[in-house]
Amino acid sequence: MRNLYLSVAVLVLATLSVSYQSCVSDVSANAVTPAKADPTEVIWHEIEDLANLQSKQQKPVIIDVYTNWCKWCKVMDEKTFSDSDLAEYLNDNFHMIKLDAETKSDITYADQTFSYIKSGRRGYHELALALCRGSLSYPSLVVLDEDNSILQVVRGYKDAAELRVLTVRS
């Protein structure tokens, strides 16, 4: 009887071991495979990465200055930036940057540190104010040349066709 229990225990342990190995290999197979960027979605970067991006490949830059509460910023994300043809065009021709105009983190850009300024109920980030040339309006798209000089600030909602026309002229 003791041998029977021992045999059953060994069989159960062997089965559990095989099942565990199968699960671990499935998980590690998924973990090793990096997700590739979908070329039909805009590839967004942080502004802190801009110098590194420009050192690898110089391109004009579009900075989407937004806030979390801005309805039209969300509509642009859902409709304009989700247009697959526009996304592919923007990814090919621009470094795309997202900047929350109310982020509370200090940001170092162009060897200068910018901070959050508490003002009223919300406040604003100094970098957003500087990029938007002193006039905050959401959404705002700031277009920079390859040397990161401001070419233009485009304020308000733009659909995919309008944005395509604006970026072709830049």
Short names for language-model regions:
Residues 57-71, 96:
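Short active-site neighborhood of thiol/selenol oxidoreductases, capturing the structured segment around
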Residues 84-87, 91-152, 169:
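Thioredoxin-like thiol-disulfide oxidoreductase module
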Residues 23-41, 126:
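N-proximal helix/coil linker or "cap" segments that precede and/or mark the start of modular domains
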Residues 1-31:
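Bacterial Sec-dependent N-terminal signal peptides
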Residues 42-61:
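A short beta-strand-turn-helix
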